[in-house]
Amino acid sequence: MSQLTHINAAGEAHMVDVSAKAETVREARAEAFVEMSAETLAMITEGRHHKGDVFATARIAGIQAAKRTWELIPLCHPLLLTKVEVHLEALTDSNRVRIESVCRLTGKTGVEMEALTAASVAALTIYDMCKAVQKDMVIGSVRLLEKTGGKSGHFKVDA
């Protein structure tokens, strides 16, 4: 098993020194889901929400969150992201919204946390915008789908 990179020999948390690492293209994809009633999902997809376009707001929130991950997660590095995408899909058969984020850069550390943060904050934004209509929505299944680049190589979740 790999060692924890953010813990030193004394067991103290620290930010990893990446100064000697080579710059490579790195990309990560993550997803999250928001479960809700059919009525709430229809309100979103039909554009009937009084606060406006829920998906557009969640998309912008996810993009902004990816850019600010280093301010939210204590040991993350500030990164110069070159791409952030947040896709939202209404899954009417299961009354869920699927959120997928993609982050990319050329740099010395990966973008997994940025992708996970983007998907998570987009989900939280959907909850925030719809909580007046439905308080028992469930945010879940937040996970890394794929990452490329860097020393640890390629990772892809099994389908």
UniProtKB/Swiss-Prot annotation:
Residues noted as binding substrate in the record, renumbered to the chain: 75-77, 113-114
Pfam families attached here? MoaC
Q: Does the keyword ATP-binding apply?
A: no
Please give the Gene Ontology molecular function terms for this protein: cyclic pyranopterin monophosphate synthase activity; GTP 3',8'-cyclase activity
**Keywords, ordered alphabetically:** Lyase, Molybdenum cofactor biosynthesis
- At the top level, the lineage of the source is Bacteria
Family in the record: Belongs to the MoaC family.
Leading EC class = lyase
* Gene Ontology terms: biological process: Mo-molybdopterin cofactor biosynthetic process
**NCBIfam families, per this entry?**
moaC (TIGR00581), PRK09364.1 (NF006870)
Which EC numbers does the record give? Answer: 4.6.1.17
* Reaction(s) the record says it catalyses: (8S)-3',8-cyclo-7,8-dihydroguanosine 5'-triphosphate = cyclic pyranopterin phosphate + diphosphate
Q: Where is the active site?
A: 128
Under which name does UniProt file this protein?
Cyclic pyranopterin monophosphate synthase
Function in brief: Catalyzes the conversion of (8S)-3',8-cyclo-7,8-dihydroguanosine 5'-triphosphate to cyclic pyranopterin monophosphate (cPMP).
The record's listing under PANTHER family reads: MOLYBDENUM COFACTOR BIOSYNTHESIS PROTEIN 1 (PTHR22960:SF0), MOLYBDOPTERIN COFACTOR SYNTHESIS PROTEIN A (PTHR22960)
The record, for InterPro entries, names: MoaC, MoaC_bact/euk, MoaC_sf, MoCo_biosynth_MoaA/MoaC, Mopterin_CF_biosynth-C_dom
Classification via HAMAP family: MoaC_B
This protein's pathway: Cofactor biosynthesis; molybdopterin biosynthesis
Q: How does it assemble?
A: Homohexamer; trimer of dimers.
Q: Does the keyword Methyltransferase apply?
A: no
